[in-house]
């Protein structure tokens, strides 16, 4: 099995600085041969060059402060997704107690815990949806928990417990069902990067990443460095079902329960394209 490449905070900050270098060259703020060095970046971010060097090399002592991360993000003209990502990598967005700095043997709530968090009312509401309304629940890590008949009509080879991105790369049916497979897969990989930023020290995330790393197209998309945490509100998924093309505009929201197993609720109505 190939060794899977993950991303550290230092690597993420280095990528952002180099991306900002390319942007400045493109808009004429830097000459083509001029480097946006650590020294230049540190001066603009009002930190020392030696500290930025330590951050990029992952040798800085202690946890980097949120204020310093914000200064670097602003200096690099990075997105809010990038901001969330570096905060996750720095351990500032721990979703469960003890996640920041947790040992590799610790893990997120189990699939069984998430399944137990689905109440009979939640399942009934999902099952009673109209035949053209695709409805399902996932964990925050995009593991499928439960879905209605309309969902399984469109995605017949999916099962509860599946990491949905693995299906996109590993199922022979995925490219036929997903009309815009490459666009959807790239979004999924960007979302996976966000998941790895937040949950990457857990055993589940490490195993899922290693399995995905076996797919060459996944590795190529991972190298692009894109990060996401949700679909755009106007994003339309295009699927092929029963020989016809359909669109779905998905609605997503988080549900929280006393079981400490948050759940993502999703639904979208099928309409002919």
Label each region the model flagged.
Residues 16, 44, 55, 86-89:
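Residues in the recognition helix of alpha-helical DNA-binding motifs
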Residues 112-140, 151, 164:
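Sensory modules in modular signal-transduction proteins
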Residues 29-32, 38-39, 45-63, 71-73:
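Recognition helix of helix-turn-helix/homeodomain-like DNA-binding domains
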Residues 108-126, 225-242:
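Extended, Lys/Arg-enriched charged tracts that mediate electrostatic binding to polyanionic substrates
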Residues 227-273:
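Low-complexity, glycine/alanine/valine/leucine- and proline-rich hydrophobic stretches
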Residues 133, 139-231, 270-272:
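PAS-family sensory domains
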């Amino acid at each position: 099995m190939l060794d899977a490449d993950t991303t550290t905070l230092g690597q993420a900050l280095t990528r952002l600085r180099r991306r900002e270098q390319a942007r400045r060259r493109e808009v004429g703020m830097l000459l083509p041969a001029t480097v946006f060095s650590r020294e230049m970046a540190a001066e603009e971010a009002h930190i020392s060059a030696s500290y930025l060097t330590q951050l990029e090399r992952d040798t800085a002592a202690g946890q980097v402060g949120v204020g310093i991360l914000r200064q670097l993000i602003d200096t690099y003209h990075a997105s809010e997704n990038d901001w969330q990502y570096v905060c996750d990598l720095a351990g500032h967005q721990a979703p469960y107690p003890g996640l920041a700095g947790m040992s590799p043997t610790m893990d997120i709530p189990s699939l069984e815990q998430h399944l137990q968090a689905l109440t009979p009312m939640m399942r009934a509401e999902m099952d009673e949806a109209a035949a053209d309304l695709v409805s399902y629940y996932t964990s925050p890590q995009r593991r499928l928990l439960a879905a209605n008949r309309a969902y399984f009509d469109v995605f017949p080879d999916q099962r509860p417990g599946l990491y949905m991105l693995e299906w996109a790369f590993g199922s022979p049916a995925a490219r036929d069902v997903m009309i815009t497979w490459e666009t959807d897969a790239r979004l999924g990989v960007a979302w996976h990067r966000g998941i790895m930023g937040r949950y990457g020290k857990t055993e589940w995330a490490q195993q899922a990443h290693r399995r995905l790393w076996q797919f060459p197209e996944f590795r190529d998309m991972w190298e692009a460095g894109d990060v996401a945490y949700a679909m755009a509100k106007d994003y339309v998924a295009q699927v092929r079902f029963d020989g016809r093309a359909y669109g779905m505009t998905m609605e997503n929201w988080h549900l929280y329960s006393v079981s400490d197993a948050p759940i993502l609720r999703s639904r979208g109505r099928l309409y002919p394209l």
